[in-house]
Amino acid sequence: MATTEHRPTERVLDILELLSNSESGMTLTELSKALEAPKSSIMPLVHTMRSRNFIYMQSETLRYFIGVATYTVGISYNNHQTSLQFIKQEMEKISSICDETCQLGIQSRNMILYIAKVESSQPIRLISSVGKQLPLYCTSLGRALLAYKSDDEIRNMFPSTLKSYTSNTVTNIDSLLKELVATRERGYAMEREETNHLINCIAVSLNYHNNPIAAISVSIPTFRLNEQKIQETVNVLFEAKRNIESHFKTFGVDFGNLD
């Protein structure tokens, strides 16, 4: 493995990463091979890590595994940073970069429930409130979640005729299904003035174990919307999605208080 900093420290971290990704553990020989380092240089590190309970050795097989001290450190981090707090930090970044309002929503039956938002500093921006609910079918947040459902599931969720909120609202199931096909192909959902006049939204789902559990969106007034703005926003959302889903994978999902 390539080294860029203090070599012994890097090897300690490399050992932790290797063992954390190995359900069957690793022998000293396997660690030596993976690290491209002699056993003589690894053994002192392993001995210290064992004595501090960051790793342990199974005496019958001589294989090393992640130890309880590693769990203690990890749970300490998780206790101080819930999933929602981490998402909120990413939303702050999104709003700062895009200078637009960013919202987080979860599914509540056939509605999207807004559970967090970060306001834009722009004088003209979307005005919304946490706790508000809107139909899944006409919001980008909702469509980002609906895209993971089958056509039959969608048809069973909604009536054939859908309520209109503006002249742009999708008002029938077939049109909604076409929009969801486009959402799957793009990797993000879009809504153009379907719930609010002159407001457009772009959203991506946040997945845990390959299931969408929430979605984040950016709301953009029509007069600030163009193809460049869309692409820049999508790129920022994709980066946040990767960061958040990586957090989910490492720490699980804990939608605790945002305070």
PLM feature spans:
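Short, highly charged C-terminal tails/helix-capping segments
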Residues: 250-259
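Short, structured helix-loop boundary elements
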Residues: 5-9, 28, 63, 67, ...
